[in-house]
């Protein structure tokens, strides 16, 4: 079925080069969009300059092109949207939905990652403070297309969460919700490491009156040492001369398969065939997938 209203996206962070785990997520989002004639947008989530690796942005773009993952429209960089984030932050602050927090990491030790609310009613000034969003004592539920039903009690399991850091950098949760709405994203396909973030995003979308996308979280690729493939663990970058072979391997990770005769095809030919055959129902219904299973 063709659905020209489908708008998906891939949103890498330039803290390092793309690796095989990145490819699995990018491929899933690309094929899910292309299989129904939808649009696939690219957004660079460059919110944290101190963590950005030199040359990573250009390397990411080159890798996507070499692997045939051509996006629609212009690249969006979050670093160009600070004015929009600040306007939203001020709106939430003015409505009493956000507040300044001066808690140090030491003060929050022992809280298990759940903010205990020390500054909730303190009335601190915004200067030299993080900004937190008040959360309700409610359970947020959603149905993920692969992971199934998921629920989270925001008050008990998360607590009031940061939407701008103390150093002035905007937090992922704020930026991703605003940018998805601004770009008209109605289908989010990404790694299962972000499953736990989704209820926070649903709550913020609800507060702001934004439409809520459909979500699909694909399994993370786990290395033999138990760590996920990721930039934090120095996973090897995708080589430029093995696009077709690694795309076929990524298809296997997503429960899809390609005939042997496509082993010598170009990346574009393989992707065109894969988009016609794409079936999201075949994606393994697990959060983690051992890399050793894909060899």
What are these regions (language model features)?
Residues 1-15, 128, 138, 227-295:
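Non-catalytic terminal extensions that flank enzyme cores
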Residues 19, 81-86, 173-174, 178, ...:
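Noncatalytic linker/hinge segments flanking ATPase motor cores
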Residues 100, 105-240, 258, 294-295:
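Active-site cores that bind ATP or allylic diphosphates and position pyrophosphate for catalysis
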Residues 1-113, 193-210, 262-265, 269:
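N-terminal Rossmann-like or analogous alpha/beta NTP/dinucleotide-binding catalytic cores
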């Amino acid at each position: 079925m063709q659905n020209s209203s489908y708008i998906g996206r891939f949103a890498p962070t330039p803290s390092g080069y793309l690796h095989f785990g990145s490819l699995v997520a990018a491929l899933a989002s690309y094929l899910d969009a292309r299989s129904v004639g939808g649009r696939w947008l690219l957004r660079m989530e460059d919110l944290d300059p101190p963590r950005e690796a030199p040359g990573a942005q250009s390397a990411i773009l080159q890798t996507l092109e070499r692997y045939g993952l051509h996006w629609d429209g212009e690249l969006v960089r979050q670093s160009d949207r600070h004015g929009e984030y600040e306007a939203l932050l001020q709106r939430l602050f003015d409505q009493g939905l956000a507040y300044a927090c001066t808690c140090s990491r030491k003060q929050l030790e022992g809280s298990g990652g759940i903010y205990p609310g020390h500054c909730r009613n303190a009335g601190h000034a915004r200067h030299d403070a993080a900004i937190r969003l008040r959360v309700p004592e409610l359970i947020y539920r959603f149905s993920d297309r692969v992971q199934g039903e998921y629920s989270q009690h925001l008050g008990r399991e998360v607590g009031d969460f940061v939407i701008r850091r103390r150093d002035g950098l905007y937090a992922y949760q704020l930026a991703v919700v605003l940018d998805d709405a601004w770009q008209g994203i109605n289908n989010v396909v990404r790694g299962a490491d972000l499953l736990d973030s989704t209820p926070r995003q649903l709550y913020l979308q609800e507060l702001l009156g934004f439409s809520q996308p459909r979500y699909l979280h694909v399994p993370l690729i786990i290395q033999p040492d138990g760590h996920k493939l990721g930039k934090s663990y120095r996973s090897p970058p995708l080589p430029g001369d093995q696009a077709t072979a690694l795309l076929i391997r990524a298809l296997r990770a997503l429960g899809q398969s390609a005939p042997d005769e496509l082993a010598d095809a170009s990346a574009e030919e393989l992707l065109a065939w894969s988009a016609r055959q794409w079936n999201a129902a075949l994606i393994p219904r697990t959060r983690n997938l051992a890399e050793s299973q894909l060899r």
